Amino acid sequence: MEQYEKVEKIGEGTYGVVYKARDRVTNETIALKKIRLEQEDEGVPSTAIREISLLKEMQHRNIVRLQDVVHSEKRLYLVFEYLDLDLKKHMDSSPEFVKDPRQVKMFLYQILCGIAYCHSHRVLHRDLKPQNLLIDRRTNSLKLADFGLARAFGIPVRTFTHEVVTLWYRAPEILLGSRHYSTPVDVWSVGCIFAEMVNRRPLFPGDSEIDELFKIFRILGTPNEETWPGVTALPDFKSTFPKWPPKDLATVVPNLDAAGLNLLSSMLCLDPSKRITARIAVEHEYFKDIKFVP
């Protein structure tokens, strides 16, 4: 750890404290994440070390780069490139950005490119939200943070500072107790973030798992065996759920054009097997008027 000098604490993430720090060798500013492990006495699980080592191989312009992993005294420190702005802060501080449909489109495109890359390497995020989408102010490019950490460390119900981990972007199959979820969970989260960028407020701001599910069902309709084969067999599905009809998404996200609504509805498909993939989403006609120059 001698190589890194902590400058200041910049936040508290899902897994532990995040510091702004300086690399004494290169003089570069970096973000240092201290991972707090549940079983402090047992040190760092070897599975976590293996998972994290794989993430160092991930290199893409829309992924926050994991530069180093430091394992010292039963603690794990992850060294990331430093970016001080996230999408939540950006939406809160400059609402005018959201009035620009091109900016929303550019951000969404970059999120999907980053996700498609991760999914092609069989890495899931599982906890995507505006707070872990980081923005480089100089280039306006967007990068995904914390990819792969859920698999290495699990997702706690509360953070180490007892904040509740948000449910607003969590896919219905996870909320219904499915143990066999996969890449579609991330596409769902991106759909929620897309709608939030356009509407300037969260789409499904539930405060408990059942409230979250019902907020989803009120808009997209309560699923049944016709619309989502197998749904009634999921562990937390109840036949007593109220049966809401689906709403027209155009009334829910009124500022989105037809192509955008088509893309959004294919991302917010309740049945994960029918949800669009990130790889196919980047080719959608909604993006036809942007030529992204790397």
UniProtKB/Swiss-Prot annotation:
Gene3D superfamilies on file: Phosphorylase Kinase, domain 1, Transferase(Phosphotransferase) domain 1
GO MF term set: ATP binding; cyclin binding; cyclin-dependent protein serine/threonine kinase activity; protein serine kinase activity; RNA polymerase II CTD heptapeptide repeat kinase activity
Phosphothreonine sites (modified residues): 14, 161
GO CC annotation: cyclin-dependent protein kinase holoenzyme complex; cytoplasm; nucleus
Regulation: Phosphorylation at Thr-14 or Tyr-15 inactivates the enzyme, while phosphorylation at Thr-161 activates it.
Gene Ontology terms describing biological process: cell division; G1/S transition of mitotic cell cycle; regulation of G2/M transition of mitotic cell cycle; regulation of meiotic cell cycle; signal transduction
Keywords from the UniProt entry: ATP-binding, Cell cycle, Cell division, Kinase, Mitosis, Nucleotide-binding, Phosphoprotein, Serine/threonine-protein kinase, Transferase
Pfam families: Pkinase (PF00069)
Residues recorded with modification Phosphotyrosine: 15
Active-site residue list: 127 (proton acceptor)
Residue span, Protein kinase domain: 4-287
Recorded superkingdom: Eukaryota
InterPro entries the UniProt entry points to: CDK, Kinase-like_dom_sf, Prot_kinase_dom, Protein_kinase_ATP_BS, Ser/Thr_kinase_AS
EC number(s) given by UniProt: 2.7.11.22, 2.7.11.23
Reaction equation(s) it catalyzes: L-seryl-[protein] + ATP = O-phospho-L-seryl-[protein] + ADP + H(+); L-threonyl-[protein] + ATP = O-phospho-L-threonyl-[protein] + ADP + H(+); [DNA-directed RNA polymerase] + ATP = phospho-[DNA-directed RNA polymerase] + ADP + H(+)
Residues at which ATP binds: 10-18, 33
Protein family per UniProt: Belongs to the protein kinase superfamily. CMGC Ser/Thr protein kinase family. CDC2/CDKX subfamily.
UniProt function note: Plays a key role in the control of the eukaryotic cell cycle. Component of the kinase complex that phosphorylates the repetitive C-terminus of RNA polymerase II.
Protein name as it appears in the record: Cell division control protein 2 homolog
